[in-house]
Regions:
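Short glycine-rich substrate-engagement loop in P-loop NTPases that contacts/grips substrate
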Residues: 72-101
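Dynamic helix-loop-helix/coil hinge segments at AAA+ ATPase domain boundaries and subdomain interfaces
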Residues: 2-23, 241-242
Length: 365
């Protein structure tokens, strides 16, 4: 558990192959740390941790702090020397991992296995940029503008929906889709392993240019505005996705603003919104809500498209069908019909003659 400085022999961010969505999400979070971090879901070997470490080299401080699963709350937020505070009336604060990660990357591998309380605390700090520590009436706070990156393998469990929604952006990685891409990734990695310094030097110009773009975007971020028409588009996308609350709207607008800043634009455009929409909606879209145009395919379970109707019409149709069913005579079923689970039609049962019963004798035995 320690802070790691970005070394020049680290794998360069600009050399990562086959993960454009992941790279974009990480850059947006680096430009605006208050987005709420990035959650990356995917199988092993899909460049999750490599990308997170490489991002740190693009930031001015270059800090990369790893949060182990066994960390305690005190190790994360820091601690207050209560005795010193009482005796000398001065707060003596011992910095935790959040303070160490200020202006850098705080990375949590297998965040789905981290205690819910720590995840909740991390997300609070990531969204506010401030770490508050309280102990027995003594409090201390400090800036903690961290770029939070959490990764998880879905085979090892899921995050609770309440925590999932609080991550600003979400990227779902798949296995390498083609043999050509596999070859490109392997060749790149082998070239780096053979000569890390030489490989990094070959990408130094691209790295410097991207770092300059990120720094410039961070500098102009707050000056970039979005027109009402863009805000209308964001609201409609979130409404169509059936998301709960307005967190998705806020994240999408902030992410679109960061994207515009990275592209050198002075205001947010529809292009910026489209570039970030799925990153903000993928983990918030409710079941049954329409996907984006590319993903509008019926699921195998649905059996095809279904047409929704107003509830009043459905109720009237059910009533009509019920009346028709009562009036229509039962139709004969073929012998080979699949009628498992159906209830047979009610049959009239004649009243049987009941033999009269002799009353009990009132005399006592």
């Amino acid at each position: 558990m320690h802070t790691e400085s970005a070394e020049p022999v680290g794998f360069p961010f600009t050399a990562i192959e086959g993960q454009p969505q992941l790279q974009m999400a990480l850059l947006l979070a680096a430009i605006d740390p208050l987005l709420g971090g990035v959650l990356v879901e995917g199988p092993r070997g899909t460049a999750k941790s490599t990308s997170a470490r490489a991002l740190a080299a693009l930031l001015p401080a270059g800090r990369f702090v790893n949060l182990p699963l066994g960390a305690t709350e005190e190790q994360l937020v820091g601690s207050i020397d209560l005795e010193a505070a009482l005796q000398r009336s001065a707060v003596q604060f011992r910095a935790g991992l959040l303070a160490q990660a200020h202006q850098g990357i705080l990375y949590v591998d297998e965040v789905n296995l981290l205690a819910d309380g720590l995840v909740d605390l991390l997300l609070d700090v990531s969204a506010s940029g401030i770490n508050r520590v309280e102990r027995d009436g003594v409090s201390h706070q400090h800036d903690a503008r961290i770029t939070l990156i959490g990764t998880m393998n879905p085979e090892e469990g899921q995050l609770r929906p309440q925590l999932l929604d609080r991550f600003g952006l979400f990227v779902r990685l798949e296995n390498v889709p083609s043999t050509a891409m596999r070859k490109a990734i392997v060749k790149t990695r082998m070239a780096f392993d053979a000569d890390p310094r030489g490989f990094f030097a070959a990408h130094a110009n691209a790295q410097a240019a991207l770092a300059a773009r990120v720094a410039a975007a961070r500098g102009v971020l707050v000056a970039i505005q979005w027109p009402d028409a863009v805000h209308d588009q964001v609201a409609q996308l979130c409404q169509d996705a059936g998301v709960e609350g307005v967190r998705a709207d806020l994240v999408m607008l902030r992410a679109a603003r960061a994207h515009a800043a990275l592209q050198g634009r002075e205001q947010v455009t529809f292009v910026d919104v489209q570039a970030v929409a799925e990153l903000a909606l993928a983990h918030r879209r409710t079941q049954g809500a329409p996907q984006s145009q590319e993903g509008d395919e019926p699921s195998p379970e649905s059996g095809g498209a279904q047409t929704s109707q107003p509830s009043g019409q459905r109720a009237d149709q059910r009533a009509d069908q019920s009346t028709d069913a009562q009036q229509a005579p039962p139709s004969p079923q073929p012998a080979n019909a699949q009628t498992w689970g159906e209830m047979s039609a009610p049959q009239a049962v004649p009243i049987q003659t009941v033999k009269a019963l002799r009353p009990f004798s009132s005399k006592k035995a």
